[in-house]
């Protein structure tokens, strides 16, 4: 069952709506959003609230729900 989420690009304030599967990894969400904004996915991380998300976690492991908003921010550790 698809989960409909919003990803917000904190750098410019724009958002996209995405459908993800419970088995999709956070890294997959970053890749899709970065491709949409023509950015290097390795330079960004996602936050859910105040929590930084790990790329290897799945949507179900982070309890992602329909209408959740994730923030895509520059990787505080510098990215690739």
Can you annotate each of these PLM segments?
Residues 1-80:
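Ubiquitin system architectures
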């Amino acid at each position: 069952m698809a989960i409909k989420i919003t990803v917000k690009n904190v750098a410019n304030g724009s958002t996209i709506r995405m459908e993800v599967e419970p088995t999709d990894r956070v890294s997959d969400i970053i890749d899709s959003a970065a491709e949409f904004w023509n950015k290097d996915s390795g330079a960004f991380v996602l936050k859910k609230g105040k929590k930084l998300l790990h790329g290897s976690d799945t949507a179900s492991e982070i309890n992602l729900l329909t209408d959740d908003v994730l923030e895509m921010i520059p990787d505080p550790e510098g990215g690739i």
